[in-house]
From Swiss-Prot:
Any one of the GO BP annotations: regulation of DNA-templated transcription
Cofactor note: Binds 1 zinc ion.
Protein name: DNA gyrase inhibitor YacG
Organism per entry: Bradyrhizobium diazoefficiens (strain JCM 10833 / BCRC 13528 / IAM 13628 / NBRC 14792 / USDA 110)
Necessary cofactors: Zn(2+)
Subunit structure: Interacts with GyrB.
Family matches, as PANTHER family: DNA GYRASE INHIBITOR YACG
Length: 60
């Protein structure tokens, strides 16, 4: 068996936060810092998944 690490043959991915090349250890980010920035944005509600504004009926 071949124990060498295989390098990806496709285009290099970039970090969605800063645009630097992503690394495997923190994929798809370039560093733990960018990964934490992204998590913080999700937790603060900065990212929103679009949906419909349905009216909610009050159940009494």
């Amino acid at each position: 068996m071949d124990d060498q690490v295989k390098m990806p043959t496709g285009p290099l991915k970039t970090c969605p936060i800063c645009g630097k090349p992503a690394v495997q250890a923190t994929h798809p980010f370039c560093s733990s810092r960018c990964r934490d920035v992204d998590l913080n944005r999700w937790l603060k509600g900065s990212y929103v998944i679009p949906g419909r504004d349905d009216e909610v009926d009050d159940v009494e």
